[in-house]
């Protein structure tokens, strides 16, 4: 099963300070490009949205510069960019903090409002995925995510709701443990959802393990986890395996504060 859980992942081009405009009159010198690792859904979405790929032998090839410094999760990306005034990288809008600054895209600031009205056009999906077999406990947690309770948390964390008319969550009688694995971009909002859910339904525990989108999708397909987290669209070969996707969010491009 595939579902969009949030709204749109805005590509926030980041440097170092709060979300807003990057003043390009800044320090002189070469720009240090900070990228994510292979397998990252954020990286996959970024190169697609910004056209940083070429087609070779019928396959799309990631053309990220070989000079880029590679980070393996969202927190490391933010810390790396914050510590280098000549750097530029990318994270989800909901992951931005006051150590970095989001670059305007075509004059539009990276805000949830601008994403919702399509002024800020750099967007990608946040999905949760499952295999063919889903436990009652996992289904109940997904019901919570897609309820008005879950959607309100998603909005509070800076993402866009998928369903403005979602109904209030009603706990079922399921018991057990739910393991969620995957994208470090989806991880923070998933942890908030899990925390709130476990206060509402004390019969179920939720464990969130952060890695990358590809690992999350494969783990859900292979039954290693109940729910996979992905910060990109699913590939044809993934959907053919029966993986289903739940959300939508935004991507931001951060740089350093001056």
What is each of the regions a protein language model found here?
Residues 4, 24-251, 257:
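Exported/periplasmic ABC-transporter solute-binding proteins
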Residues 4-24:
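Sec-dependent N-terminal signal peptides of Gram-positive bacterial secreted proteins and lipoproteins
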